[in-house]
Amino acid sequence: MKRHAAALLAAAALATPAWADPGVTPNRILLGQAAVFSGPAAQLGIQMRNGIKAYLDYVNANGGVHGRRIDLITEDDKYETAVAPAASKRLIEEHKVFALLGYVGTPTGAAHLPVTTAAKVPLVGMFTGAEILRVPMNRYVFHVRASYYDETEKIVEQVVSTGGKKIAVFYQNDAYGEAGRKGTEIALTKRGMKIFSSGTVERNTVKVEDAVKAINATEPDAVVMVSAYTSCAEFIRQMKKVGSGATFYNVSFVGSKALADALGTDGSGVAISQVVPFPWGTAVPVVKEYQDLAKKAGFTDYNFSAMEGFLTAKVMVEGLKRAGKSPTREGLVEALEGMRDVDLGGFYVSYSPTNHAGSKFVDLTIIGRNGKFLR
């Protein structure tokens, strides 16, 4: 009996492909996303997921990748650092995902990475541009968007070119906010300038009164804003209420559509840096593709966050295609590192064994009088 059992075990071992990492079966590949799906920043995770699903639905309707459908499972990290590690652990240890994508946030990202990196699970696309998640380079993390340093450089360049000299910073009191503050400082230092004044807000709150008082007292020409959309909206409303004439500039993480919705009529003239193409245009092929597939998936509320999710999914799928018919996590890493100047339809990403930055694309948009975005 023991010999028979041993023979069965040996046969089973031989029948199991040597490449079979968790999350891969003959018919499917399981991906995981841990992001914020509840609380003040929920729309960021929801829209990111919508963009991802729009592209994965299309891929699956057309035979999947090497005959396997690509499924997505999500966990809510609530944009809380204390919750984040457990969310990634559930994806990796309980759900046994093959790879990860579409994470959201700097502080939560920093809390997730020790878990995902220790497990050597590839992670594609983080909705954050913070340097602390990019330097030193992490072998298992592939960024799709430009950094906050790239964004704040673009913002400062714009402010200075239009005559602005007094530049303040309103930022979230955590790693995300500090990344944007530091980027602004670097951009100003290059021009022989300094941050004129600053104020902070705690994560997941809208207690901005002290920041409004400190910044408004200095009468800045412009305010660079590095926080979530709820606190940024409240800050702008209160600044306008006290008569500030400053121009407000947000980095992309704010969630453009969510900010515009939260501001209503107070949003006119507010600027936002963007790290993906304008999602309402038609000139860029990948934008038209996003619009068509989002509509098929039932997501007709086009926005920058979903556009980023869509591009993230495209990068992941391209990596899976290049990883071959017998994918492994290490094979996916190597496949992604081989993607040099890949055209996703007018949006380019490039990786190598020493560079996982992906893109440096940055654009500026403004909220118009009707809440729609202008370039």
Language model features with spans:
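Acidic/histidine-rich, surface-exposed loop or edge segments in extracytoplasmic proteins
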Residues: 32-40, 272
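Extracellular/periplasmic Venus flytrap/periplasmic-binding protein
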Residues: 83-86, 130-132, 139-243, 278-288, ...
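Loop/turn elements at helix/coil->beta-strand transitions in domains of secreted/extracellular proteins
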Residues: 27-29, 67-70, 94-99, 118-122, ...
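Beta-alpha junction/loop-to-helix N-cap segments that form part of ligand/metal-binding clefts
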Residues: 22, 28-30, 43-50, 58-132, ...
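Segments of small-molecule ligand-sensing domains
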Residues: 296-306, 317-373
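Periplasmic-binding protein-like
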Residues: 91-104, 124-126, 168-171, 219-228, ...
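Extracellular/periplasmic periplasmic-binding protein-like sensory domains
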Residues: 236-309, 367, 371-374
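Short, low-complexity disordered leader/linker segments with a strong preference
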Residues: 1-30, 374
